[in-house]
From Swiss-Prot:
Species classification: Eukaryota, Metazoa, Ecdysozoa, Arthropoda, Hexapoda
Name of the protein this chain belongs to: Cytosolic carboxypeptidase Nna1
GO CC field: centriole; cytoplasm; microtubule cytoskeleton; mitochondrion
Biased composition (Basic residues): 478-491
Compartment(s) of residence: Mitochondrion
Cited function: Metallocarboxypeptidase.
Organism field: Drosophila melanogaster (Fruit fly)
Amino acid sequence: MAEREREAMSASLSRLLRTLSSASMSRRHCPLALLQPIPLHQSEIALGSASSGGSAERCCSSCSDDSNNNERCKSAERGTAADEVGEEGREEVELESKEDAVEGEQDELELKRDSSTVNVNVVRANFKCNDMECSLVLGDYVNGFLGSFLSKGLKTNQLVVNTDEKTLRPVARLKEPRDLFALPKDKDNDCSQQAPRWPVECQVIEERIIHIPYVPAVPEPLNAPTGNELKPRPVGEENGIVVFSYSPISAVNYEKPKAKKEDDESSDESDYSSDSRQDSTPPSRSTPMRLAGGGECAPGKLNSVSKMINNVDNRSTSASLDDNDDYYDDEYDTSGGYCGGSGEAKEKAIIKDLIEAKKKRYQEEAEVTPVGGGTARNSRAASRSEASKDASDIDDIWKNNTSEYKPASPRYVLSQFGKNVTKAVIDRIVDHEDLVPPSGSQKVSNQFAVGPVKLPKTNIARLEVAFERSACQDRSKSRLKKKMSSSRRRRESTSDEDSSSSSLGNEEDEEVDDSDSDAENTGSGIGLRRILGSYSARLAGGAEKCPCPGSGSVSDTETLVGDESRSRLAGSNGLHQQDVVCSRNRQAQSRSPLRSVPHTHAATVAAAAAALARGRNRDKDGCLGGKDEKNMGMGVGTTGTSSMGTRTSSPVRNNVFRLSKDQHILLNSMTSQETTGTLISSTSTNQTTTTTNSSQSFLCSDLPQAQFSRSAVGGARFMTNCHPMNPEEYDGLEFESRFESGNLAKAVQITPTYYELYLRPDLYTSRSKQWFYFRVRRTRRKMLYRFSIVNLVKSDSLYNDGMQPVMYSTLGAKEKSEGWRRCGDNICYYRNDDESASSSANEDDEDNSTYTLTFTIEFEHDDDTVFFAHSYPYTYSDLQDYLMEIQRHPVKSKFCKLRLLCRTLAGNNVYYLTVTAPSSNEENMRRKKSIVVSARVHPSETPASWMMKGLMDFITGDTTVAKRLRHKFIFKLVPMLNPDGVIVGNTRNSLTGKDLNRQYRTVIRETYPSIWYTKAMIRRLIEECGVAMYCDMHAHSRKHNIFIYGCENKRNPEKKLTEQVFPLMLHKNSADRFSFESCKFKIQRSKEGTGRIVVWMLGITNSYTIEASFGGSSLGSRKGTHFNTQDYEHMGRAFCETLLDYCDENPNKVKRHAKLFKQIKKIRKREKREQKALKLQKMADQGCIMNDKLKVKRSVEKSVS
């Protein structure tokens, strides 16, 4: 092989790796490491000129224009030595690949490179491996090759690519700062307290929950299961009433369609997973789409509030690289001149501006009479300009808002859409001769349309489509209607003027007027227009009460949904049947008695508003309806289907109407406040099929591979109403979880005393649902309630072994000073009989199964506020309050320094404490070894925080043992490694959707900052003073007692069994809580990424994971009792006391260690004998069975013979 050809191949690979560095493509992860460098065709590559030493290659012309790439090329020419980097205080860590190159020849290597960018889109390599033809196809690196969650880990300027002189392979080097932020020197500035920073997808209530400390005088006993507990199977929300629904919209971004926009500009600094608006979030059906070049989905104005929501959504999904996401610095300033002042005054000014803008727009619409075509065009132009002006004003309000500012309420948003829908009812006679079909750019594919929010009912999206479609079609109808006869036009324009000039308040006043005249005018649309006016007023969720007939008489399940089995009735004369149905519904309403049932329509509206706030450009189906009707030569009022308004038999049944491919279904949803059915008029079969497919893709399509970029922070500004109940009509429990560490997603009322609860999975994941924390209000005393949490994922739990959940009563805390206590009777944890459990073909049945925790509770107070949780909560705010107290303490602050370790993906501070006795003698400080203790890497394991609190209380106290420990050691305490997960209420993962306790081998600092900096801190401590012990605190959900996991030293005879001395001493000091028999010291392959094993591999013998049970103890005097916060804190103190005994150099303590060592040997020998006996017993049992079978077989043979 010619030398020049080898150099050419090396240059091409260098350029490839340099290009892929922006997508976190380090050398060790690159699949091209498996390929032997071989020459390419001269026409395919541009030969790079080798340097004199052959140690670096120049970039080709494709990246010569990029300044960043030029800088990387210059740094690459500096050589392979790590100490030649020009910046002072920085070092390079060489990441050399250890994979062996596969021998063979490469037939073809094609690099398809976009002319406007240096990003590699597709790489296909054909080569031979073990005399076999192989083909390697590498996908789009920029869209996240390294995993399903990471799209931008290592930035471009953090990789330096050189060429190895010996192997001629490109070597990626990661630049790291020499002065690690983990251990700042000579910095005495205090850490300030920070408000929790939420992902922008999450809604946050303005309420800080503070609980009083409380420990029961007598340990609470474990529950005694009888085995006869009731096991109700999940009924599902379709057979109940959704009384709470909150599911944060995921911030993951979906892979791009193959067709890209021509105006999309890409660069090395862009985030491909979140910059593109159409690709980051599926197109929306909820808002009209204003296309580029003046094209519109439908003629008419785009609602100003919809523009505001879209602008908010664009900000929320963009991956901002700025660390300071401050929305509150600028003062609010509009044309009204509001600037400065308090947040309350600004909020009033904002509301006033919105109200004035709305009145002005309505007044202009009332003044302009659309008699002629020019006047109508002027009216539409004025409305469009006014809408754009409002949108800009609202956008300015959003930019300059304050913390007290709340955007427009759902009532304001839905009233706009409700007004558009009522125009659809007025314009009944349609001529489609001049209907302009939508352009090609409007036909956006729905292939990747997925629901951005888990809606409480599948019919919500279809209902939203129906609303938008009717509004979209009506705008076209209003234009075409102007070409009719003059007499008909005058009558139509008169009714149109009356309807458009009346405001929302006037509509509400007119609704209670002559009902007979409304029934007579149904054919012209006036009656239904008034009905829908009242309906749009009710969509606000009961914020304002309006005097409308039947406001509390019918179930909202019946009003919004209707009966699926009866909503598909076909008819030939649609208009006549609609008149008949309307009159029948009027009569049925007048005859039906008033019924008070819980509301569900506001939950539907809330979810629809959430989808509206997140959706963009999803109303494509509404544009296709006009074209289909034109092609078929039919209108809405000529031929179609209608459905009879029927009454739902069960008040708790929540049926859905589905769009069928086989039937002509009406898409103009005309829902009445008084009726319990749904009036539908049809379109063509093609239109129905299109809508069906899009609805299915919106609700049921498979999610493409999601890629996590980075979550914006601050919490959702647009607050939707998660509580659908109307206090006057709903008398059940009120649920809430939009506070710190809360994770309830949905509450469904099956009966007045039975509720099914659904937990939200860890953010950006679909599993990990075990932790729960929620609030209940409006309780009734001496009434037995049953709660069933129906979507848990662990196959076993301590709930089947006597464990109980915890509760906190607000009135109990005030009257009796009670805090968190155990609660619940008839507790049972069992597997659901779902489809995955009954399917024998699925190999992953166990992984896909869900489990239910059910228990009963009887409240002691009326109208109480009660919190329920899996274990005693300990939030990020609780930790900060505690740390600030230490920092402000006059004595503790002298030997306890609070520092900032790093910031998380959401920008939350990760703190660490350095606790040691100050000394002026540097030699004494160097002799001190360090103790590293961390906690809460898993957000749901709150007992770890209580143990850490007990440890910090003891080590900062004034006892003799604490003083001796501070003089002997340097304590490095990281009390909360995963604050992001704690804040949002995750069970196990961080915002990356990954378990941080499996990422201790990571080199990606930006993705796992707390883990990376903790490991860097440990490495530095090992070099400076040494680490005597490392301990990571956790909690366990399947075992009782407290125990330790360690790492055995089989291959080192000198250290064999030494790692077990400290756990045995801890058992001696806390015999009724800590179990040495439960301790394990094995190293499993699945745990190689944990902190315990990674630190042990760094040379730390005493590397432990301490596990505290969520349940209780089975030892000594505490046998059969629950653990409480005092028990966990006691274990933290016992840890410190045992540490001093373990490291004491007193001869008596040394002799004690020798005795303990012998005792450990005896224990392990006994365990081996017992294990051997068990194996022999099993073999004997199997042998006996075989012997019995042989005896039976022989006896049968004898009898036969």
